[in-house]
Amino acid sequence: MPVRAEARAAWRVVALALLLLPAMPAASPPLTPRPLQPSMPHVCAEQKLTLVGHRQPCVQAFSRIVPVWRRTGCAQQAWCIGQERRTVYYMSYRQVYATEARTVFRCCPGWSQKPGQEGCLSDVDECASANGGCEGPCCNTVGGFYCRCPPGYQLQGDGKTCQDVDECRAHNGGCQHRCVNTPGSYLCECKPGFRLHTDGRTCLAISSCTLGNGGCQHQCVQLTVTQHRCQCRPQYQLQEDGRRCVRRSPCAEGNGGCMHICQELRGLAHCGCHPGYQLAADRKTCEDVDECALGLAQCAHGCLNTQGSFKCVCHAGYELGADGRQCYRIEMEIVNSCEAGNGGCSHGCSHTSTGPLCTCPRGYELDEDQKTCIDIDDCANSPCCQQACANTPGGYECSCFAGYRLNTDGCGCEDVDECASGHGGCEHHCSNLAGSFQCFCEAGYRLDEDRRGCTSLEESVVDLDGRLPFVRPLPHIAVLRDELPRLFQDDYGAEEEAAAAELRGEHTLTEKFVCLDHSFGHDCSLTCDDCRNGGTCFPGQDGCDCPEGWTGIICNETCPPDTFGKNCSSPCTCQNGGTCDPVLGACRCPPGVSGAHCEDGCPKGFYGKHCRKKCHCANRGRCHRLYGACLCDPGLYGRFCHLACPPWAFGPGCSEDCLCEQSHTRSCNPKDGSCSCKAGFQGERCQAECESGFFGPGCRHRCTCQPGVACDPVSGECRTQCPPGYQGEDCGQECPVGTFGVNCSGSCSCVGAPCHRVTGECLCPPGKTGEDCGADCPEGRWGLGCQEICPACEHGASCNPETGTCLCLPGFVGSRCQDTCSAGWYGTGCQIRCACANDGHCDPTTGRCSCAPGWTGLSCQRACDSGHWGPDCIHPCNCSAGHGNCDAVSGLCLCEAGYEGPRCEQSCRQGYYGPSCEQKCRCEHGAACDHVSGACTCPAGWRGSFCEHACPAGFFGLDCDSACNCSAGAPCDAVTGSCICPAGRWGPRCAQSCPPLTFGLNCSQICTCFNGASCDSVTGQCHCAPGWMGPTCLQACPPGLYGKNCQHSCLCRNGGRCDPILGQCTCPEGWTGLACENECLPGHYAAGCQLNCSCLHGGICDRLTGHCLCPAGWTGDKCQSSCVSGTFGVHCEEHCACRKGASCHHVTGACFCPPGWRGPHCEQACPRGWFGEACAQRCLCPTNASCHHVTGECRCPPGFTGLSCEQACQPGTFGKDCEHLCQCPGETWACDPASGVCTCAAGYHGTGCLQRCPSGRYGPGCEHICKCLNGGTCDPATGACYCPAGFLGADCSLACPQGRFGPSCAHVCACRQGAACDPVSGACICSPGKTGVRCEHGCPQDRFGKGCELKCACRNGGLCHATNGSCSCPLGWMGPHCEHACPAGRYGAACLLECFCQNNGSCEPTTGACLCGPGFYGQACEHSCPSGFHGPGCQRVCECQQGAPCDPVSGQCLCPAGFHGQFCEKGCESGSFGDGCLQQCNCHTGVPCDPISGLCLCPPGRTGAACDLDCRRGRFGPGCALRCDCGGGADCDPISGQCHCVDSYMGPTCREVPTQISSSRPAPQHPSSRAMKH
């Protein structure tokens, strides 16, 4: 209907509702919304689809048989009543629903109606709820809203979601070089060599010199835009880093023209000279300084000038001292260099021609100074210690672990036998172990927790009421016996008995606790199931009986070391470190040991695993039995003990140091370290001189001098009284330095100065004074006796008290220290070169540098840091921070680009930029210019390097970086970004189309369209709704046309009608499809095939009427029923032909046969052997039995029964199905199950079946022979075997397995030690060497064999083998019963080893050790006694002196050449030499000869074989062996070497000229440069 009519109808309904409402109070009439009308503001019309129901008529038809009168088909009558099928039609109605469009009025989007308002006048804030669905900001408008996105994002098509804007896609984002997009923004990047301008888009070339001067110290030269190089100012050169500059060294070329030293100072070359030279007048050449002429040499005798130095010389008879200046008299005496302070050596000192040679005793070595002896860590060099080693000063000490003690050799360790002392605290037995011991108990006992006491395994205790003893097994009950077992079967029985009697009264403890229910353990938590490792339970099930080798409460612990056997109660008898097998006790011997008990160690002289390796130790040294290392006797050392101790060492291995005073001692005994003193000394360490009146070796001789005359303690000669200051036989020798007085017996007490040889008065050197010369000269004095006055030293210098020269302070030089150091030098004597660089000034005293402007650092090597300038960079720059830096020298500001002014505090004036503000800006459209780079900052709407380009379409604002936010491609203002909407769009973003019924620019025009037509928002053209046409859509579609503007033709066929709007066809009955072109599908009928048939089982539906046409086998209105039984086929008109009561299929008529039948009509029974449903089951009857074809039940033959005839007839029955009872006379008869004939039962035979089967036969009629073995009997009925004790198996053919016995082998043997038991009785059959009920004991020591019945016949300590009685002889014995001792020349076990003794040595039969005769030693007596020893065992010390050897047998001394006498104590008399002093010397008269070689010992001035020739010219001294050192043509004395000067020469070597001549030389011009060098 028209809109207004609908509105009026709605108003009527509302008015009627208001009239029917009950009356309300007049005071508060309710405000109800006014119904919306299209004329009200902001009201929009909508088409709403609703379901509308209405009745639809439907014509139905059905058929029935009615009686009718008819004329045909009547028999003899004209009319008759017949049956006729009639179709009846009737009208019915159904409710049909269809969707209809209805116009409703609602508030336009963005508006709402409040009570009392006419129309929609209230704006809706869509942003208040869930932000309006916007991802970004939500903006509410009057009547609507819109979503916005943050800058850099844009709205997607849904108007709500924001998506990142890739600004780089449009004009590269305005970037000059590279644009990088980021979420919500972007950034510009520049190529290498460019930098980004302040606008963030423009790239400026980097002028590398403008940034920090390019890193250059002086000047930066720009090569390209990005490249530069550094350049130095004149007189400077570039360093390797290419940036810093250093001044060119003037000394680099030609040493600056200097002869010696060239040094740069403030850029100029300054020459210097080496010490001993001075600069000449040209300031470049160096000339020698004559130290002798200037008095700088300070030589005691004479001075000789040399180039650059000088040399002091001494007069004849004197020699130059170590200081190179003092001269000392030459004493013609050979001085022992070791006498003074032991030559500086810490231990031994030996005098040589080159000075003292230090030596160290054994265990020490020389330190780097070659004088001090330091200890050697002997333990690190594999000493002889067997266990532990501790290093000591000069040696080491061996020690042993607990349970061991040190052997007498000081190296090896021997086990301590703890059992030897107090029985080791053991109650029963004690067995010594290596390093320890172990207690053991007798059989039937076990060790207590203290591992010493013994507790009985089963204790017999007399009950308190006096009844018989009862047994309580341990460990459940702790009860002590009232008697003590005897520990040993020896002579101590009386003592043990006394001790037992004493203790009986104390051992009366009763039980502690008892475990119940066959449990045991300290907490009764263990049972027999816990026994491990083959352990079995005791008969009382109160503990585990462990096998050999195991112990512990549950047999989970192996035997402790050195124990074995049952309960680990047997002690191991292994010796020499052998280990014991925990089960059998067999010994496993270590290398070098053999024998059943490891009792056979290696004999002396052999070692190794099998004692086959021969020791190589000399001097009777003993050998380690495993490794063969030699263990030396005292006085010997070396790998083979073949070396005698070196001097000053003694003891085993020469490991001890002699404590003798070596300078006073002749020798140290290498065995015990006793000291043999030199003549003149005595004491244990030879530390004391002979007492007055005694002399000689040991001070045993008394002096024979007159009273008051001293005696020489060495020779006993009487000393002569010399005048003070002299000594010697003829008193011709002056006292040596440091002594004075009579016989030079006084010692000087001067401090570093000599004394007068007569009076002892100190002779002070220059600069010293005082009685002992210990004081320096007073201030202002110097020289001998401090008599000279010091010169006037300047600048705080002091005077040298020895020479009087001024000692200048650092920084000053000159004879009076009046001059400061030359430029470039500083310190004491101005000898240290300054290290100041870059024109830095050096302090002459400290050398500290004062840097030139622009430099700093300790050596002025570092340029000023940025922000500082001036000397030492002490001034801060006064330039504006960040706008410029200052010159490091002058401090003037050097402005950065874009700044100017004295302090770089001003930016460039407008329109200019760059360094010094000299470049002009090029910006357009009023853009601002950067004063540093000249880059332009564009105003809104412009872009480009110079702002010459307007913003591209879609962008606006500053830098055009804002994207327009307009919809539908609307442009925006380039400056403000506001959207310019085209026709048909409106809103801030032009996102909204014109409201309904409006169009054009700004939606200002009204549309004139009807019938639901829409209006084009741009042109106002009407777009008609489907089914209408015309300019204003007022014309309906003509028939045959439909759709929008009625442009489509209808396609309906077969009488179908067409809808003018959608073109849909309405089909008649029986047709369907879009164009009614298809007949109804099966199951559907009526108009449009909209009704469904309900035909079942494949019935066909009539497409017009819906009636069902049923298939074969089915019937009923809907074909829902199958044919009745006995019928089948179409309309169920055919009848079944099945037999045996079988039914047939209602469609095909096929027969369903019952079980046991088959065939087309079920007329045949199942074939033989098959039965059941479809005859598919196979009969299970025996071959001779048949089964029923229906049930499968078997028809059994006579004698069998059961479902499968598997059971024979029960005894007493027979026949078919076992239905008959047997009629046999008694139980000894059996009935045949098939025929019932009676025969004898199994196990019986004979007439009347009364006789049992004889032994060995069984079965019916006793026809079968028994097959039982080993005495087994068989059952007479079944033949089953009954085995006797000791056998088992079906035929008793198997003997009991080892360890079991008795009937069915059900009992376990209790034999020990692996013994077998009798399989019948269980009695143990012990192997030879074992005895006891359970074979748990070995044979006693003197018994052997089976049952230990045989007595051993071993003698001399031989051990008897418990099995066969064979004897194991101890060392040194042989024979079947060890009855023979080893014959001569043989030794060891069974005397199998052959002796190797030499030099008539005899062999010890046990170990094979050789017993050497006098003069020989060694394992085989192969060595004669070492030097210094003789006699039996080389134990006697030779008393020969002078190191002479003695005869090793007799001890007679064999004197060396030059000595004779019984002990070689006498030297050869004058004129004799050689062995025994029997040869005569052949020397000039009065000349002695060497007592050994006989060579003549020429006095000074003589030479030749017989010393009968004078020295030739230029030679002097003893044997003329010294060369003269005389100059000036002088000759030297052939005896003393003193020079005899000629031609006015003087000095000790006659090379000095008189003083008048030397003083005439010119003095040097520059005394400040003098140097003293020698």
From Swiss-Prot:
GO terms for molecular function: calcium ion binding; scavenger receptor activity. Disulfide bonds join C44-C108, C74-C80, C107-C120, C127-C138, C134-C147, C149-C162, C168-C179, C175-C188, C190-C203, C209-C220, C216-C230, C232-C245, C251-C262, C258-C271, C273-C286, C292-C303, C299-C312, C314-C327, C338-C349, C345-C358, C360-C373, C379-C389, C385-C398, C400-C411, C419-C430, C426-C439, C441-C454, C524-C537, C531-C544, C546-C555, C568-C580, C574-C587, C589-C598, C611-C623, C617-C630, C632-C641, C654-C668, C660-C675, C677-C686, C699-C711, C705-C718, C722-C731, C744-C755, C750-C762, C764-C773, C786-C799, C793-C806, C808-C817, C830-C842, C836-C849, C851-C860, C873-C886, C879-C893, C895-C904, C917-C929, C923-C936, C938-C947, C960-C972, C966-C979, C981-C990, C1003-C1015, C1009-C1022, C1024-C1033, C1046-C1058, C1052-C1065, C1067-C1076, C1089-C1101, C1095-C1108, C1110-C1119, C1132-C1144, C1138-C1151, C1153-C1162, C1175-C1187, C1181-C1194, C1196-C1205, C1218-C1231, C1224-C1238, C1240-C1249, C1262-C1274, C1268-C1281, C1283-C1292, C1305-C1317, C1311-C1324, C1326-C1335, C1348-C1360, C1354-C1367, C1369-C1378, C1391-C1403, C1397-C1410, C1412-C1421, C1434-C1446, C1440-C1453, C1455-C1464, C1477-C1489, C1483-C1496, C1498-C1507, C1520-C1532, C1526-C1539, C1541-C1550. InterPro entries: cEGF, EGF-like_Ca-bd_dom, EGF-like_dom, EGF-type_Asp/Asn_hydroxyl_site, EGF_Ca-bd_CS, EGF_extracell, EMI_domain, Growth_fac_rcpt_cys_sf. SMART domains: EGF, EGF_CA, EGF_Lam. Residues 1555-1568 have a biased composition (Polar residues). It is found in: Secreted. Expressed in lung. This is Multiple epidermal growth factor-like domains protein 6. It comes from Rattus norvegicus (Rat).
